[in-house]
């Protein structure tokens, strides 16, 4: 079983491998089969501290136009539960600047992740 320390520690491996940190991410797609997973993912991926996600999302910080737009196509709760594939398609759209009204301006770096810390960072040719 995973200990509390292991689950709560932010996943820094993906950032170290990419040579980036959470502040470099322009758009974030997270596994959100259940609403609380968005909050847990923000904490686990290092966008805020443990126990701080509820405050972090206030004032539109994760909305389109916010500090870190999350699940710009609506996430699994809106699009359907395709185990993250629709989120991968949204990442490609964002990085190609083909997301239409959902486009994050000048998106260069996108991240996909889960509340357990699984994560992939993508970049376009502008990175």
Place the predicted regions along the sequence by residue.
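Claisen-condensing/thiolase-fold acyl-transfer catalytic domains that form or cleave C-C bonds
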Residues: 1-127
